[in-house]
Amino acid sequence: MENGSRSKLLEDPYVKRVWDLIMGESLFKKSPEDLASLRESLRRECLQYFARHSPYYVDLFERLEIDPAKATLHDIAKLAIPSDMLRGDGQKRFLIQDLEEGGETFSSSGTTGKDPVRVYRSPVDLAIMLKANTDLFEHVYGDVLKQGEGVALFMAAPELRYKLSFVAFVDLTLDKKGIELLYGMDLEDKAQAGTPWQKLTTNKENLLKFLKSKKEPKLFFTAPAGVHILGQKFESMGFGKKFAYKLASGAPPIRLGKGGIIVTGGGSKGFADLPPYPQLVSNAQKHFVSKSVEGKQIETPFMDVLGMTETLTALIDRYGVMDKVPHPLAEAFLLDPLTFEPIEEEGMEGILGIFNPFTTSWLEVFYPGDIMTWHSSKGFYGKEFVYKRRLSVKEGWDLQRACGGTLEEMMTKQ
């Protein structure tokens, strides 16, 4: 955050405006109409910003006959790229000329046999990523993560902090909040047919520490496979083993305490043989116990984060309360799979497109290959998004899975 606040890019009026909006008063208090108007102005200022900082975009806008000062959502749809174009060094062509060093590069797993998607985040982008995602998370969570209170378990390995953006966001946010983060997995390097690959194995010490902790709230971050596998483990225990485990750890059930929650990453996709997400939630609620912040016993709440390497901010939902919503300044839209024109009709399936006007290093507008629908909402965004499925290889689509899917593959690979 400190490096971002010292960025020379803040001398640009657009970056300064975006920074002030992200770091300022809550955007979630604005009406959907005010936010839509704000996104429209940012859309146009954003394209003008990139035209000032890279001749690549000047040429691109001319070729596509886009006037940045009058840019519409249809123009943004024309600018959207498939995530495949970011594999290897693909992002380099899209980066601004006066790119600032000192940031971090995130990548996909590379387990598909192709070059992984790699995306560089400058110091100012990292600061915006941290603040924007934290604000969105707390809004959907329904409360502020209080400084130094609680403990979190992430069913991932610490090495993935510097690889997967979902892990990085959680790590950075909890570090900023002074909340203890335990990693529940270790990374094991193996070789298969001469190709290195990685497998996640359980860190029993950290898992036990989380289970025995008296801190509240307990935040459990995992791919959907993680919570499913843990539930199956409890169900398969005999009486004697379950009794011994309960003496050692206090579980089952796993008590998450006041404000305790399970946060999954990426929905129920990946290569695990998983039940539908509603069934996964129902099964898990037999083994996890939570209380409201007031101390009342409730069904353990679930949140799901749809994030991928390519996006600075995620879409997040809270099961049974709200479907997926983006950050107030992010533009989430659906594209017709045949025409790639924006879909305006409610309830129609389309390819998710994401435009983040607050990303300063490259014009972050892309489609990762997820089919979704949208419906009207009384919330801050005016609409919510429902995940349906990935586009398949048979449909001509062979792109990157979200971070949660990557974690699932690592957790279930034999």
Indicate where each model-derived feature is located.
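Phosphate-/polyanion-interacting regions in eukaryotic proteins
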Residues: 157-159, 169-172, 176
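Conserved adenylate-forming
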Residues: 109-165
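Active-site diphosphate/adenylate-binding microenvironment
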Residues: 49-107, 115-122, 135-139, 143
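Hydrophobic (often cysteine-bearing) scaffold residues that line and stabilize catalytic clefts
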Residues: 35, 39, 53
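Short, surface-exposed acidic
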Residues: 67-74, 146-147, 291-302
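Active-site glycine/GP-rich loop and adjacent strand/helix microenvironment
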Residues: 1-32, 40-41, 45-48, 173-414
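Short, internal active-site loops enriched in acidic
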Residues: 82, 157-160, 226, 309
